[in-house]
From Swiss-Prot:
It comes from Gallus gallus (Chicken). Ca(2+) 2 binds at residues 232, 234, 240, 252-253. Transmembrane segments: none annotated. This is Collectin-11. Keywords: Calcium, Coiled coil, Collagen, Developmental protein, Disulfide bond, Immunity, Innate immunity, Lectin, Mannose-binding, Metal-binding, Secreted, Signal. Expressed in the tongue, crop, crop mucosa, coprodeum, urodeum, proctoderm, colon, lung, ovary, uterus, testis, vitelline membrane, kidney, ureter, liver and skin. SUPFAM superfamilies: C-type lectin-like. A carbohydrate binds at residues 200, 240, 244, 252-254. Residues 149-265 form the C-type lectin domain.
């Protein structure tokens, strides 16, 4: 196709020259003139690859790409600023009683009153009523039934108290929290619990003075006999320093601040 086009252009050029020569013969004779005909040549072969040009201008910002997958978890950042103080939490449980403080200074003498004798009498009556109330509770528990061995009497007290409160209760009546030091005593207390329809009670064993060193409530060391359940004692939450007996006769270490029923032990010779 390209060759035909070149050939056609050549013919047209020759025809045009012929017309010029026939129309102006004298002028051509007088003046010699050279005419150059520019005809496009054939397409040449591809040249060598040129050098790398200068970088072009930045193009337009393209559309945002698709959302990629979530990357790996980054490293822990530095601690942020302290936030605002949160709302006040709910009221917690009552804590254990603290140690008794030192006695305070003597107060100023009161104003003499004619009713001082009456007030003294009322105060003494209040003390007596409180003592009678306590003794009535004790008698009520005793009437409900006790358990005996050759040397001991055991009383189940159905008043929920913390460990130290239960210990003081028994001491105030000439006894102590029950101390099962052999299989017979342990079985008797377990039977007592079952017949009362209970699941657990405090007994007189603790490691309050030294963690892991359990002793009886009279501070005598434990010997070879024990009834620890599987995995016990475990001192869960680092606060289990007292011991309970469950209905099966097994022992668990528990927190001293919880409340439950308990068993007092008395020597027969002191009753």
């Amino acid at each position: 196709m390209k060759r035909d086009l070149v050939f056609l252009v050549t013919l047209i050029s020759l025809a045009f020259l012929s017309l010029l020569r026939s129309g102006y013969p004298q002028h051509i004779a007088e003046e010699s003139c050279s005419v150059q005909i520019l005809v496009p040549g054939l397409k040449g072969e591809a040249g060598e690859k040129g050098e790398k040009g200068a970088p072009g201008r930045p193009g337009r910002v393209g559309p945002p790409g698709e959302k990629g997958e979530m990357g790996d978890k980054g490293q822990k950042g530095s601690m942020g600023r302290h936030g605002k103080i949160g709302p006040i939490g709910s009221k917690g449980e009552k804590g254990d009683n603290g140690d008794m403080g030192p006695p305070g200074p003597n107060g100023d003498p009161g104003i003499p009153c004619e009713c001082s004798q009456l007030r003294k009498a009322i105060g003494e009556m209040d003390i007596q009523v409180a003592q009678l109330t306590t003794e009535l509770k004790f008698i009520k528990n005793a009437v409900a039934g006790v358990r005996e061995t050759d040397n001991k009497i055991y009383l189940l007290v159905k008043e929920e108290k913390r460990y130290k409160e239960a210990q003081l209760y028994c001491h105030g009546r000439g006894g102590t929290l029950s101390m099962p030091k052999d299989e017979n005593a342990n079985n008797l207390i377990a039977s007592y619990i079952n017949q009362a329809g209970l699941t657990r009670v405090f007994i007189g064993i603790n490691d309050l003075e030294k963690e892991g060193n359990f002793v009886y409530s009279d501070r005598s060391p434990m010997q070879t006999f024990n009834k620890w359940r599987s995995g016990e004692p475990n001192n869960a939450y680092d606060e289990e320093d007292c011991v309970e007996m469950v209905a099966s006769g097994g022992w668990n270490d528990v927190a001293c601040h919880i409340t439950m029923y308990f068993v007092c032990e008395f020597d027969k010779e002191n009753v």
